[in-house]
């Protein structure tokens, strides 16, 4: 990382590892609040760790999940939509509580393979096209 000019990331990772060892033994915490208390951990990273490491139902709010949600429900998506409570509430309500890890992986795959950002989405191959507002209007 240092040759890439990312020395600050090395320092963050070091500080984070040190705090994890001091505060939690050697176990990465499973509680979102504990993760957020660590240096360099954002809301998204904390949610991703809870979901992918611990299979806890945490929403992943990013441009991809917001784009899919906007298209599904026919909502206008703006740069600020990631911070919009309406999108957060919808994304949270849709999480599969029994298999949140699989659900979030599927959502990210959908965003990268079918519900594309810069190209027209591939609605014909979309598993949710029958109830997607965007697909019905295209």
Locate predicted features.
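Catalytic cores of DNA base-excision repair glycosylases
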Residues: 1-137
């Amino acid at each position: 990382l240092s040759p890439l000019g990312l020395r600050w990331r090395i320092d963050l990772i070091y500080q984070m590892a040190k705090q994890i060892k001091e505060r939690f033994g050697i176990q990465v915490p499973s509680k979102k609040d504990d993760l957020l208390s660590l240096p360099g951990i954002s809301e998204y990273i904390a949610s991703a760790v809870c979901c992918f490491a611990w299979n806890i139902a945490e929403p992943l709010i990013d441009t991809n999940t917001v784009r899919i949600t906007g298209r599904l429900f026919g909502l206008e998506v703006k740069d600020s939509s990631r911070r919009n409570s309406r999108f957060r509430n919808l994304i949270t309500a849709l999480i599969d509580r029994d298999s949140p890890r699989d659900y979030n992986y599927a959502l990210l795959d959908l965003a990268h393979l079918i519900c594309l950002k810069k190209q027209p989405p591939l609605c014909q191959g979309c598993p949710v096209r029958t109830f997607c507002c965007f697909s019905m209007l295209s």
